Each structure stands twice: as C-alpha cells, then as structure tokens.
C-alpha cells in the first residue's frame, strides 16, 4: 500500500506501525482503513484518520469527505493559554465529525461577541461553541442567547453557568477545585491562606470564592463571614495575580490559591520581589494546568481543568442539538484534579 505524504512536503513517509500505534489499533486494521476497506467500527476508522492528522500527514484523497458544515468557536483573547488548549480540542473533535471550525477571537478594540455571532450567522454556521463568553458575566444581558434560539441557531457554552440561559453548559467544578487546593495547603501546615481570583461578576470567580469560604470553614474552622478578608478580586492575569499576592502577603498569608495559572505566576513574582522564596516562604497553587507551567521555576502546583473531557462533551452536546436530538439544557459539571509540583511545600513557622 502507499502511505500518505506529509503535509509539509518533506520526503519522509510515516511507518504503518506509527499510525497504528497512534490510533491504538493493529497494523492490519490501520491498513484496511488507509486502503478504503471497511474497518470493524466507524469509531476505529475515525481513530486512524485522527492519527494521520496528529502525525501531520494528509489523508488519502479517497478518505477525505466534504465538510458537514461550519461551526463557530467564539473565544476570549488567546493570551491565556487555557483558551487555545480548549480551542484545539474543540477543533479536533469537530474535524473528526466532518465539520469545519471557524475560530472567532475577541481582542481589545476588536469585534464584540455580538458582532462575531452576527458574522457567523451570515456565513451560515450550523452551530456555535461559546468559550468563557458573556454568558459567564452576570451583568450581561442573557437575552442575546434567547434570540439565537429563536433564530434556530444551536449553541453550547463552556465555563460560566447561567440559569437564565436555556442551553447545554459544560463547566469544571470550581468550588471543588478551590476546596482541594485549600486542603492541600492545610495538609502542608498552612493556616493563613488567601485567594486571588477574578471579578465577582463572573460566575467562575464567584464559585471559587464560595468554595474558598466553604473550605476555610470546613478545614480550618474560619467563620464564613471572615473568609472575605482573605480574598482579593482582580484581573485573571499575571499583573492581577501580582497585585493580589502583594496585598495578601501584607496580611501574612503563607499559602495562596489563584484563579488561574497566570495569576499564580504573578504571585510568584510578587513573592520574589519581596525577597521571599517559593515554596519555602510562600506556597502557590494555580488553576488550569496550562501548557508549560510544569516547566516554570518552580514548576507550578495547580488544579487541572479536564479540558479534553469538557471540550469533547461540549461538541457532543452541540452535534446532538444540530441533529435535533433531545439535549438536556442544563449544566454538565466535570471534576478537576490537583497536580502537585514544586510551588508548594510544608510550612515551617520561623523556618
């Protein structure tokens, strides 16, 4: 059989064994798919074709199919690495079902979410995936989404459940994420723990703050009405984390939980500017498990969002809507995971 050529035009040709290993199938099965002969299941065929894509090789002409349609993906600006991570999985999942993703990124001074949606509708998209959009802002008018439904445009929303919007939502358990971070710091001996999080009008920020108050009460016995003293609300950015950490350090906090990995990196910077060592003097926990945080100095302890599971579920719900199948217009909540690295350590008073 003739294996496909690489997309970059280089002469190297992939081994059948590489494709089979990537797809987790036998070489015989991979060969049947590449030669256009039926495989045992459609899902097997999709795995082999996805393996070709991941290895960077063009699909054989006979295996290509016309696009099933266009799906819009509306995201915030991509400076936060968690958003490109979500976008990549969503795009791969859509491509696996034959859809062509149309990425629409919001940038300062650029098109608004409403303007991007209007452009997508003009292009005749089959549906839209919203990632951390206006639906997560409790001060935004939710009627924009009701109007989408009235116009017959299927959509799904990732992060930021809003009970005023009737649509499938996919979210991480923000409260649980913060509780496990606080538990981790408490187990290391920390008793003065602070939270750096985004503005209260955003649902994920609000839920993280609620989880923080619950955790302080359950684990450290801190009255809920006192938890707010240990919360700083700012931007989900390095600069925001830097400012929040500076304030919490002045309060004597030895452990910080941050609402994003970028905020956590800002907290590390704030500690070092004050001559403090991370983690000897200050333990820091991020949120997201963004690409590269395992390689920062120190490697960042963080709470991992289940990006692949969430993005795949969002695509599945959207495709069910497009197919006019019954879809629960509710929130699908996914459990995060604590990833312990080098930015947290045992607290030794006076050490």
Curated annotation (Swiss-Prot):
PROSITE patterns assigned: HTH_LACI_1, HTH_LACI_2
Ranges in coiled-coil conformation: none
Biological role: Putative sugar-binding regulatory protein for the alpha-amylase gene.
DNA-binding region per Swiss-Prot/TrEMBL record: 16-35
Keywords: DNA-binding, Transcription, Transcription regulation
Top-level taxon of the source organism: Bacteria
The protein, known as: Uncharacterized HTH-type transcriptional regulator in aml 5'region
Any one GO MF annotation of this record: transcription cis-regulatory region binding
Pfam families from the UniProt entry: LacI (PF00356), Peripla_BP_3 (PF13377)
HTH lacI-type domain span: 14-69
């Amino acid at each position: 059989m003739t294996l496909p050529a690489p997309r970059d035009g280089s002469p190297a040709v992939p081994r059948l064994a590489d494709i089979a290993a990537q797809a987790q199938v036998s070489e015989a099965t991979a060969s049947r798919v590449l030669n256009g002969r039926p495989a045992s299941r459609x899902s097997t065929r999709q795995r082999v074709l996805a393996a070709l894509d991941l290895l960077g090789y063009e699909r054989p002409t006979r295996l290509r199919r016309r696009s099933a349609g266009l799906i819009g993906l509306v995201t915030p600006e991509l400076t936060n690495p968690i958003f490109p991570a979500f976008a990549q999985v969503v795009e791969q999942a859509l491509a696996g079902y034959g859809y062509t993703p149309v990425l629409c990124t919001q940038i300062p001074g650029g098109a608004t979410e409403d303007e991007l949606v209007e452009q997508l509708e003009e292009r005749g998209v089959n549906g839209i995936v919203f990632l951390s959009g206006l639906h997560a802002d409790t001060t935004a008018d939710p009627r924009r989404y009701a109007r989408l439904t009235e116009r017959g445009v299927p959509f799904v929303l990732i992060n930021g459940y809003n009970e005023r919007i009737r649509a499938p939502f996919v979210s991480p358990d923000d409260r649980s994420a913060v509780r496990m971070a606080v538990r981790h710091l408490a187990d290391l001996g920390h008793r003065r723990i602070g939270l750096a999080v985004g503005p209260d009008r955003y649902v994920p920020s609000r839920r993280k703050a609620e989880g923080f108050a619950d955790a302080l009460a359950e684990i450290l016995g801190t009255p809920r009405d006192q938890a707010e003293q240990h919360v700083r609300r700012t931007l989900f950015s390095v600069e925001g984390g830097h400012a929040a950490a500076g304030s919490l350090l002045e309060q004597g906090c030895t452990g910080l939980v941050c609402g994003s990995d970028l905020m956590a990196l800002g907290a590390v910077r704030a500690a070092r500017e004050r001559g403090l060592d991370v983690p000897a003097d200050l333990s820091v926990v991020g949120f997201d498990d963004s690409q590269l945080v395992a390689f920062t100095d120190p490697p960042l302890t963080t709470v991992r969002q289940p990006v692949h599971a969430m993005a795949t579920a969002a695509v599945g719900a959207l495709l069910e809507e497009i197919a006019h199948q019954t879809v629960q217009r509710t929130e699908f909540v996914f459990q995060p995971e604590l990833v312990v690295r080098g930015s947290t350590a045992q607290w030794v008073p006076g050490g």
